[in-house]
């Protein structure tokens, strides 16, 4: 049933038509979403995401510092080792024995010229000799220090004791070394390349390096200057490079990572 109503002017009107006219008469608010503003919004969002990504990468790189260290050299194979490190743009520190330095002076000079760090590993690498008395470790390190300085002009305070500073480096031995400014460097990743003479040592290093890095610690990797290590080293260097690890050298002004006795040190005699 159609109901007719009387308008204020006295004319009859259809309410549905009146409503439609009222709707048509209402102004519609328009939003200006132009293409230029939309593009600007997208660009800003991209820039914010890029900045977040760059910050994350910077933090990631900062926390992924690795120290490669090589003991017992130099050797007839050290030149190949340096070639490999340079090929992968890796830095490293070499703890060397006095007699070996004298036998391979050119490669030691090359280390220095190419920005590698050099340190002392003693003279004898014989536990019964280097740990025979409180001043014996100091004597060997002073001799090694002089050999390096006379050859290269570099005054290094970096030392690594044969077999590490535990258990044979007693407290009195440590005091003598400290008084002469030596920095005793041990390690927190033992490659065991002296026993695992194949790529098993690489797998071990990769696992322990990743674990330490995730924990926010910088891996100090113990390796040896010998043919078996050099043979499988490319696998390790390639992994470090692809996973954005940054290698650095040890320096005289760093606080060293040193094993603490905690009741474990004793005299060998």
Predicted regions span which residues?
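N-terminal pre-catalytic segment of deacetylase/amide-hydrolase enzymes
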Residues: 1-69, 74-87, 207, 239, ...
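Alpha-helical scaffold elements lining the catalytic groove of polysaccharide deacetylases
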Residues: 126-151, 165-216
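Catalytic grooves of carbohydrate-active enzymes
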Residues: 214-251
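Short low-complexity, flexible loop/linker segments enriched in glycine and/or proline
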Residues: 108-110, 134-136, 199-202, 262-266
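Active-site beta-loop-alpha junctions enriched in small/polar residues
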Residues: 73, 97-99, 123, 162-164, ...
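Loop/helix-junction capping segments adjacent to catalytic residues or to phosphate/diphosphate-binding pockets
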Residues: 75-76, 101-105, 167, 195-196, ...
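Active-site beta->alpha N-cap acidic-glycine motif
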Residues: 37-132, 136-150, 236-239, 255
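Structural recognition of the beta-strand scaffold that forms the well-ordered cores
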Residues: 67-69, 92-96, 117-122, 157-160, ...
């Amino acid at each position: 049933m159609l109901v007719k109503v009387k308008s204020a002017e006295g004319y009859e009107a259809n309410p549905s038509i009146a409503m439609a006219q009222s709707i048509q008469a209402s102004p519609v608010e328009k939003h200006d979403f132009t293409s230029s503003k939309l593009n600007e919004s997208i660009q800003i969002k991209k820039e914010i995401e890029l900045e977040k990504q760059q910050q994350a990468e910077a933090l990631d790189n900062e926390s992924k510092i690795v120290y490669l260290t090589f003991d017992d050299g130099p050797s007839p194979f050290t030149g190949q080792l340096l070639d490999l490190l340079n090929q992968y743009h890796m830095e490293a520190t070499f703890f060397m024995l006095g007699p070996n330095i004298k036998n391979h002076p050119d490669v030691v000079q090359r280390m220095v010229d190419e920005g590698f760090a050099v340190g002392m590993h003693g003279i004898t690498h014989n536990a019964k000799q280097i740990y025979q008395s409180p001043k014996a470790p100091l004597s060997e390190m002073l001799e090694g220090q002089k050999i390096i300085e006379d050859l290269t002009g570099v005054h290094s305070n970096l030392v690594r004791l044969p077999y590490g500073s535990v258990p044979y480096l007693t407290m009195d031995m440590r005091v003598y070394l400290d008084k002469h400014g030596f920095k005793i460097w041990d390690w927190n990743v033992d490659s065991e390349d002296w026993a695992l003479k194949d790529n098993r040592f690489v797998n071990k290093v990769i696992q322990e390096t990743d674990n330490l890095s995730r924990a926010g610690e910088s891996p100090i990797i113990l390796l040896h200057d010998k043919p078996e290590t050099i043979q499988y080293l490319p696998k390790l260097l390639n992994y470090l490079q692809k996973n954005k690890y940054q290698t650095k050298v040890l320096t005289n002004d760093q606080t060293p990572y040193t094993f603490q006795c905690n009741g474990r040190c004793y005299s060998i005699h």
